[in-house]
Structures are given as structure tokens and as C-alpha cells.
Amino acid sequence: MPSLLLVVFILQLLLHIINTVGANTVNELLWVLYNKLPTPTSGSAQRCQVLKQDIVRLKRELGNTSPQDNFSKWAKLDRQHNKAMAEYQKLDGSLRSHQATFTSAVSTVRWLGTQGLRFVLQFWFSRSPMFWMPAGWVPYYVEWILSFPRAPLGSVSINVWGIACASIISLAAEATAAIWVLVTHKPTPMAAEKQREKQEAMAFSANQKPAEKEL
């Protein structure tokens, strides 16, 4: 059986990762991984990606084709674009409905496996010492705080140990991020990825809105 000290530390590490990355990002990542597997929505998700690329390509070709100079080509591209957009919107609506159900289930499981497990451990082991401190090492009131709420006096409780783990993990993460920025002179990979995703979403929205007006 793993040490309770290690279990609490790993649990706090998972909570820190989820809070840093963001619950929505975790849900999106799991949704992408879910669609990589042979699931009921994997085919629709792959088709949506293909349609998304086709819409951007067709919109670009439409912009480069003059209806006055080459109307037949422009009309053909316009029909293809409208057809792809209609199919994409239909599939996207269906996928969003499935994703909402998936996200709700994942959020429940994630909460039970992190916050819920933490509450259970803190309640179940509230009277158990994580470890003992040398006698007389700290004043009485410090011993009382470290054993809060119900651990034996002179020991460190699971609540205090969890707080200590969370603080150490947070400080280590901030130090690592600061060193990364100082050494590479670049934003952290997480910040760079969020910026890239934001730019891609804005680019697709810019291509989609004019098409909706044409419809």
C-alpha cells in the first residue's frame, strides 16, 4: 500500500496541474483523445475536421476568384462552400450535444477522483498523524496548529500536510516557469499553446462569419 504522505502529495500535484492547465482544457483534451478511439463520435469528429479545412480552403479560393471574370468557377466554388458549411454546421451541432454529455460525466469523475477523494481522506485520517516532530522542537501553539483539527498533539495532521504539499508544489511551479522564461526568453509552452489556439479560433471565425451572411 502506498504511503499516505505520498498519496496526499500526488493528489495535490494533480489538483495543481488541473488548476494550472484549466478544467476546460483538460475536458477538451480528453474529448480529443476520446474521439481518437473507435467511439460512436470518432467518425463525425474526423469528418468535422476535414470539413473545417475544406471550408477555409474554399473560402480562400472564392476570395481569389472573380465572379465577373470566371463566373462558372466562382459559382461552383460557392456551391461547394455552402454545401460544406451546411454539413459542418449539422455535424458540429450533433458533436456539441455529445460533448456536453461527455464533459458533464468527465467533470463528475474528475471531481470525485480529486476533490472528493481529498475530502474523504481528510475525514477518514483526521485523527492519524502523518509524522511526528521531535519533542519540544516548536512551541505548544505551533504544535496545536500543526495537529489541527484532530491529530495527536506533536504530530502533523493530514490537513496541514496537504496545505504544505500544495504550497511547495505551487512555489516549485512558479520557480520553474520563471527559470524557463529567463533562460529561453519565451513564454511557457502552456501560455504559447493557449495563444496559438486563440489565434486559430479567431481565424476560423473570421472565415465562417462572411459565409453565414452569404447563406
UniProtKB/Swiss-Prot annotation:
Signal peptide span: none
GO molecular function: protein-membrane adaptor activity
The keyword Signal is annotated on this UniProt entry: no
GO cellular component labels: endoplasmic reticulum membrane; GET complex
Chief localization: endoplasmic reticulum
Subunit structure: Interacts with get3.
Topology Lumenal: residue spans: 1-4, 132-155
Intracellular or extracellular location(s): Endoplasmic reticulum membrane
Similarity comment: Belongs to the WRB/GET1 family.
Keywords: Coiled coil, Endoplasmic reticulum, Membrane, Transmembrane, Transmembrane helix, Transport
PANTHER family (alphabetical): GUIDED ENTRY OF TAIL-ANCHORED PROTEINS FACTOR 1, TAIL-ANCHORED PROTEIN INSERTION RECEPTOR WRB
Cytoplasmic side: 25-110, 173-215
Coiled-coil regions listed: 45-96
Official protein name in the record: Protein get1
